[in-house]
Every structure is written in structure tokens, then in C-alpha cells.
Amino acid sequence: MSDLTKFNKFFLTPNKLNAFLRVIGLCGLFSVIAISFGIYSYTRNEIPNIASLFLIVLGSVVLFLAFVIHFAALFKRNKLLKKVNKENRTNLWQKEMGNFKAIESFEFFEQGPISSDILPSFYPTALYNFEPLPRQFKVTYKDGSEFVFGHIYAIKRSSNKTEKVACLIAITPAINSENHFFLTDANYSLNKNVAQFEALTENKKQENISLFVEKDSNFSFQNLDTEVLNKVLFNPLNVYAKFNVYNDTVHTYLFMSVPTTFMDTKLKVNEAFDDLVTNIKLQASYDFKTLNSMQKVVDLLHNKLIKKPESKSSSQKSVETEIEKEVKDKLAKN
């Protein structure tokens, strides 16, 4: 990490810098009062003109210096922030993630298996500009399970200020190897120009959910667990995360909205430089919880989303066996 002098660290310590700027602000306020009193006295001749002029000049000089010092301090802080944030501290974040007992290893990919055109529908491409390629990594847990994740940013188009959103993508073996489908919000219009979605021509709707499938496919909401759909994936009361599920018979992609601070190791304006390592530890802790939440949803997809064929009870089987015997006996007699 960057080694900064005490002088530079002062500008990256919000408590100290803000206290200094408040003092400068008070000096500016008193200078305005002095200028106002000087002008008032000069026009009313209540004190000698030389004293009034002195107050006006002194107040003007102090006000100018207060403005220059305030501007210079903020400029210096922003310049140092940019310098500090040019450093890539992902290795520190990765090290902290690896310290959690549940994680065996954490590996980043130069170029992972998630393609750049696999994008979430809850941030439509008409409204957001997405990063060209997700940042991808593999997490191996001590229980033997492995997950490949992609993390992608998008910035809102035609916005006066930078509005970022972020999404996490988990790729796993297909939860259903026979059906090609996409689960999303009911109001979403599928972009058929995307290669993955080209074959999905049928749209089945149920309340606030859309299920896109291939033409003549028998796959429907009857094959899906209602509780997982309504209470987890598309719960309107869940304001913390939005989900999509895309299954292409080889892989399943789970999309989940995450805070823009996910994997963010940059120093913020309201954070002190000396607390940077501590803040990265805290960020890793939040991100670990996010990955755990996503892991639980992935487990639900694999274990519960697709309804399993109902097995016949032993009584049903015995009744069917008796009927079969009766039919065979009748056929034998005939």
C-alpha cells in the first residue's frame, strides 16, 4: 500500500480535515461580518473612515484566503484519493476472504466461463451500460462444493450523475438438463437478439413472474416450486435483492443484485487512510455474507425449484398390483 507522509495523511483523515475546514469556515464568516460592519460604519460615519476601510480590507483578505485554503484542501484531498485508489488492493480482499473458515480457496480468472452477453434483466440494457466483461472468480468451500461467480457493474445511461448498479452471477451445472428456460420479472420483454435467448419464444406468466421457454415446450409453472418462486426469487417484499434464473440445459445462471460496494477496496471520502485495512476486512465480511446468501439460493434451485415426480405410495402400488392381477386372470379365462 502507498506510504503517505503525516501531512498527506491529514487530508485523508476526515475528522481532522473536517475540523480544520470548520475553522476556516468560521474565519470566512467572521470576515463577512467584518466587511459588513466596515461598510455600514463607512456609510454612517460612526467610526473613523480609516478604521472602516481597514475592516473592509482585512475582512476581504481573510475571506479570500479562507476561500483559497478551503478549495486547496479539498483539491489536495481529491488528488490524494485518486492516487491511493489507483492501487489494486484486490489481493488484500482476497486474502481476507480466504481467512473465513468455510472457504478452502479463492481463485480469480483472467477469462472465465461467463460470457459478456449474459446479463440480468432487472437492469435492462436500454437503461444501463454494462461492463464489457464480468470479473470472475471461483470459490471452493471446505465442504467440497465449488461455485464460479461473475461480478458485473452497470452505469445508468443519460444520467447527470454517475448511478452505478451491480450484479453477481453464479454459474452451476444445469438444474434441468432437458429444458431451456429463463425466469424473470413479469414486465420484462426478452431481447431475442441475444444468442442465449434466441430460441426462447414462448412467454408464460404467473402473477409477477415471466417464464420464457422454447416453442412447444411442455415445461411450465407446474414444474416449479411455488414457495421458492414467491418467497425467495420473486418476493415483492424483498427490497434487498432481485433475482433471475437462466437454464440452458448445460448450465444454470443465477443473477442477484448486490450493493455497488461489493468487492470495493477503494478508500471512500468518509474513510480515514489509516483505517483502510480494517475497512477492507469489514468489506470482505459483508461480501462473505452475500456469497453465503447466494450459495443458499443456489442450493434451493438445485434441491427444490424443479418439482420432483411424485412417488407412488405403497397403498397405491398394492392397489395397482391387485388390479393388474385381476385383468390378467380375466384375460387368461377368456
From Swiss-Prot:
Stretch list, region Disordered: 308-334
Topology in the lipid bilayer: Multi-pass membrane protein
Compartments where found: Cell membrane
Keyword Plastid: no
Species name: Mycoplasma genitalium (strain ATCC 33530 / DSM 19775 / NCTC 10195 / G37) (Mycoplasmoides genitalium)
Transmembrane is among the record's keywords: yes
Protein name, entry field: Uncharacterized protein MG456
Residue ranges, compositional bias (Basic and acidic residues): 319-334
Broad class of where this protein is predominantly found: membrane
Annotated keywords: Cell membrane, Membrane, Transmembrane, Transmembrane helix
GO cellular component: plasma membrane
Transmembrane segments: 19-39, 55-75
